[in-house]
């Protein structure tokens, strides 16, 4: 039977091997068969972790972005994560889902008390977009905050489509508030007060490979469906932005300080390629990310 997730994972393993690709392909095919046959071959434990957890969501996002297949947010976990612990958001998401269920599949909903994943996904996406559209209603600095959320979302949308899966489920970032330009610092404070961006309570490691702690931020998770960003946090790579880059993302709709190349991770300033223009494919509303439909 076809298994696009396993096939893509196999290709990823081959690409990361430094030996002969043909031998690597035969080896990973053997490991895959052993994993599904449950015969205990060496390396099946690592393959199992990559297949069921580490890369499953990232691979699903990538495959769906290539084939323009819908990705779905649905279920209690998705609603809880997207709500960011905000009771109002949680209730509004549930209300929107029920309202859509009564409109699109009333008989099924009344008979079974259940809502299909497609209807849940549509409702969550629409609510996410409506919340994003409301950012400009913030009287002070609303347009700047909208620019910032848009640019950050575009960056992580690009990360999620990386063909080598170097940034699986990356959705957090780092910057120094004290080093910002005075007005930019004020804008960030307004954005935080409205929970448009959220600061982690405790400083965390910047990246898995750098033993340095810093303040970690993310945009409100209710916006994640717009940009096809996983609500899970892997924390392997948290790109760091300078005050000039933060200023650019606040003041321009089309500012992208990071451009992915094929060789390096953007873990520090020396590994970033600047690009003040946005890749035309960065903002893609082709559908919804989160709890993926693996069918």
Q: Language-model segments: which ranges?
A:
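Composition- and surface-driven signal marking solvent-exposed, interaction-prone regions
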Residues: 77, 92-96, 103-111, 202-213
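Winged-helix-like regulatory helical subdomains adjacent to P-loop NTPase cores
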Residues: 21-24, 28-32, 36, 71-73, ...
């Amino acid at each position: 039977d076809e298994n696009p997730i396993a096939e893509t994972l196999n290709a990823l393993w081959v690409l990361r091997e430094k030996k002969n690709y043909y031998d690597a392909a035969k080896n990973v095919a053997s490991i895959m068969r052993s994993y599904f046959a449950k015969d205990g071959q060496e390396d099946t434990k690592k393959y199992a972790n990559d297949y069921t957890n580490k890369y499953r969501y990232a691979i699903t996002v990538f495959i769906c972005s290539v084939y323009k297949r819908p990705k779905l947010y649905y279920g209690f976990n998705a609603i809880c994560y997207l709500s960011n612990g905000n009771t109002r958001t949680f209730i509004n998401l549930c209300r929107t889902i029920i309202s859509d269920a009564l409109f699109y599949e009333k008989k099924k909903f009344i008979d079974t008390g259940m809502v299909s994943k497609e209807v849940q996904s549509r409702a969550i996406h629409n609510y996410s977009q409506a919340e994003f559209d409301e950012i400009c209603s913030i009287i002070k600095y609303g347009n700047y905050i909208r620019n910032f959320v848009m640019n950050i979302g575009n960056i992580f949308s690009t990360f999620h489509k990386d063909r080598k899966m170097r940034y699986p489920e990356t959705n957090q970032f780092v910057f120094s508030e004290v080093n910002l330009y005075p007005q930019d610092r004020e804008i960030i404070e307004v954005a935080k007060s409205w929970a448009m961006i959220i600061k982690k309570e405790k400083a965390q490691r910047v990246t898995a490979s750098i033993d340095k702690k810093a303040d970690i931020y993310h945009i409100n998770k209710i916006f994640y469906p717009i940009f096809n960003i996983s609500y899970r946090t892997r924390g392997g790579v948290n790109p760091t932005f300078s005050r000039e880059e933060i200023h650019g993302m606040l003041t321009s709709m089309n500012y992208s300080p990071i451009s992915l190349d094929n060789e390096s991770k953007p873990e520090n300033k020396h590994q970033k390629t600047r690009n003040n223009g946005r890749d035309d494919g960065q903002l893609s509303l082709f559908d919804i990310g989160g709890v993926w439909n693996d069918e």
